[in-house]
From Swiss-Prot:
It catalyses: L-seryl-[protein] + ATP = O-phospho-L-seryl-[protein] + ADP + H(+); L-threonyl-[protein] + ATP = O-phospho-L-threonyl-[protein] + ADP + H(+). GO terms for molecular function: ATP binding; protein serine kinase activity; protein serine/threonine kinase activity. PANTHER family: CAMK FAMILY PROTEIN KINASE (PTHR44899), SERINE_THREONINE-PROTEIN KINASE NEK1 (PTHR44899:SF3). This is Putative serine/threonine-protein kinase B. It holds the Pfam family Pkinase. Its EC number is 2.7.11.1. The gene is NRKB.
Length: 431
């Protein structure tokens, strides 16, 4: 039996008998290899991915087929372009567009050795905007990506960013509830809270992954990390992360805080993100830079400019208003006894008295006001209930700050917890 794909992928000595020349390996996976390949016809470079189907489970075979099915339906400058595929002797060959500058993970990893620098704000913003445009296209075609991570963000010498690897992609139909999938998949560091809680999820899970990726681009590290999955789940569900570098504007950091919200109902869609004034302005700057870039084909520019123009001209959806700049409501007042989870290694719950008054959260040891600590509501990102499975206590709610810090409180009843969450949301102008 001859080697599979011998008439398609060969070596330099077989140029006249094959369509592509193997120019060297670029990656290894559990079930195969990826090669840089040169098309004999015109000398252009692409990537040839060869996978051994005989070693795969039924589920992994479905994921392999996804790498063909979904990119075939995608035609966008910020998504790796599918070229062709072949199957022979239990081997699958997929030929895809080649990105000549590696992937984003390779740009971030050197930071751990000290051999790297932070991205400048406009660089990080333009990376993020292109990924948003790719995800907007994917979601508009009723697809989920489900494996957004730095290793799947491919870079080119033209400045274009390409989202690749559709192995976990999923096609869906819109439903009344907006819930479309339940399969637990993707890379753990980027998984949304709803997946850790084994809940059904929708395109907001992709948005969470994009938020984790944006934090990684800005901070050169992941927002949530641990030595095991249980520890990672705990950190993701707690929703706390280290502040981003001061070199980035507060407006840009607020974008991260707005995305990394545990409740998907309070998390913006990609389209709603575009309505944030900072992002909206960034899109206009991106188009200006795009038009001046002589390394990008005019036909590619036209596609991106057309998409951005459509986004900028679209009306703000009713739901999007709650993701724009909020207005602190100084009239909201709420007081009551709570238990607060302390920090440090010996974490314990301690009785406290909490107040919302005149645009501030004030925490004291008792109702008499001893040992007061205040927090301006402008520094509060949101509040949400914490499931019993996570908190191991009833009636717990979390308060998240703009800087990424979190505080957990235990109310005296379920109704009291709901009143606290609603009062905080009213106070910060999102309810």
């Amino acid at each position: 039996m001859s080697e599979p794909f011998s008439t398609i992928l060969g070596t330099d000595g077989s140029g006249g008998r094959c369509k592509y020349l193997n120019k060297g390996i670029v990656g290894l996976g559990s079930y195969g290899e990826g090669y840089v390949a040169e098309r004999v016809e015109d000398g252009s470079l692409c990537v040839a991915k060869v996978m051994d189907l005989s070693k795969m489970s039924r589920r992994d075979k479905r994921y392999a087929q996804s790498e063909i099915k979904y990119p075939t339906n995608c035609n966008h400058p910020n998504i790796i372009r599918y070229i062709e595929d072949h199957e022979e002797n239990d081997r699958l060959l997929i030929v895809m567009e080649f990105a000549d500058s590696g992937n984003l993970d390779e740009q971030i990893k050197p930071w751990g050795t000290g051999d790297a620098r932070y991205f400048q704000e406009h660089e990080a913003l333009f990376l993020f905007l292109q990924l948003c445009l790719a995800l907007d296209y994917i979601h508009s075609h009723k697809m989920l990506h489900r494996d957004i991570k730095s290793a799947n963000v491919l870079l080119t010498s033209t400045g274009l960013v390409k989202l690749g690897d559709f192995g976990f992609s999923h096609q869906y139909e819109d439903t009344v509830s907006g819930v479309v999938a339940s399969t637990f998949c993707g890379t753990p560091y980027y998984l949304a809270p709803e997946l850790w809680n084994n809940l059904r999820y929708n395109k907001k899970a992709d948005v969470w992954s994009l938020g984790v990726l944006l934090y990684e681009i800005m901070g050169m590290k992941k927002p949530f990390s641990a030595s095991n999955l249980k520890g990672l789940m705990s950190k993701v569900l707690a929703g706390t992360y280290a502040p981003l570098p001061d070199s980035f504007s507060s407006e840009f950091k607020r974008v991260v805080d707005g995305i990394l919200v545990a409740d998907p109902n309070d998390r913006p869609s990609v389209r709603e993100n575009f309505q944030i004034p900072y992002i909206n302005k960034g899109l206009k700057l991106f188009v200006q830079a795009l038009k001046k870039n002589e390394r990008i084909l005019d036909s590619v520019k036209e596609v991106l400019v057309s998409q951005v123009s459509e986004i900028l001209s679209s009306e703000v959806s009713p739901d999007a208003h709650r993701f724009l700049e909020s207005q602190i409501n100084y009239d909201v007042t709420h007081r009551g006894h709570v238990n607060k989870l302390g920090g440090g290694n010996g974490k314990s719950w301690k009785p406290r008295f909490l107040q919302i008054v005149r645009g501030q959260l004030i925490l004291t040891d008792d109702e008499e006001g001893n040992n007061p600590k205040g927090l301006n509501l402008e520094q509060v990102q949101g509040a949400c209930p914490v499931p019993y499975s996570t908190a191991k206590r009833d009636f717990v709610f979390a308060l998240n700050t703009v800087g990424g810090e979190g505080m957990w409180f235990q109310a005296v009843s379920h109704g009291d917890m709901e009143m606290w969450v609603h009062a905080i949301q009213r106070g910060i102008g999102v309810a």
